[in-house]
Every structure is written in C-alpha cells, then in structure tokens.
Amino acid sequence: MEFLAELHPKVVHFPIALLLTFIFLELIGTLLNKEFYTKTAHLILFLGVIGTILAVLTGNQAFIAYEYWNPASEALFNNHQTFANLTVWYFAGLLVLRTYLIVKKKYLKTIKYIFLALTLFGGYLVYQTSEYGGELVKKYGIGTELKINDTEIND
C-alpha cells in the first residue's frame, strides 16, 4: 500500500481547495440569496467529502509507511489525524443534513443562516488539519524526499 502513501501529498490539496470553495460559495449564496451559488456549493461539498475520504485513506497509509517517527512528530501527527477525521465526519454530516433538508424542501432562509454558521466552523477544522499537516512537512520533512549530501552543503 505504499502507492497510496505516496499519493497523500498529491491528493490532500484537492479537498482543502474544494471545502474552502464550498464555504465561499455557501457564504455568497446565502448572503445574496442566489440559488445558483447554493446549488453549486452543494456539488462542491459532495466532491470535497470524497476528496477528504481519499486524503484520510492515503494519509493513514503514509503514516504506516513512514519509519522515522519520534515522540514529537508522532504527537503532531496524532493532532493532524484527529482534525482530519473530525473534518471528514463533520463535512460528511453537513452533506447528509443539507441533502435531507433540500429533499424535504426545508432548506429555507433561517436554516441557511444556521447552516452557514456550521459551515464556517468547518473552515476552522480544515485550517487546523492543514496547519498540523504543514508542520509535519516543515519541521520533520515528512512526505518529502529531501536528500542533502556534502556537495550541496558546501555550495
């Protein structure tokens, strides 16, 4: 499953972009009361949830494949994993709830504003997941193939 581990750095940016785009479209659609934006937001949310599932699956494989964990990097990974799992479940729940409300024709103005607040909190989860993931790369080089030899140091 090392193949999946190698995909994580390539896959992970799609759900980040999709979920942040969803939040933006949800904000615009709710504030301007434009159905085009809210319908587009629903589609982007669906794609974002699929992306987060793929990111978590590949991230779990990347954790297994990496051999050089120390207590500090593993603690940072645990925070990253916790927020990643929260993000997947949170946005999947929003997708199910939103779909239900739309099907039952209950996705009305007051509900849209409540849903917008829930959506903005989801943005916080995306941010925290990204922050911890970025720290894993920046501090520990996890997910990179950085190789430094003596000739590079002396240049």
Regions found by a protein language model. Name each.
Residues M1-D155:
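Polytopic transmembrane helical bundles with strong interfacial aromatic enrichment
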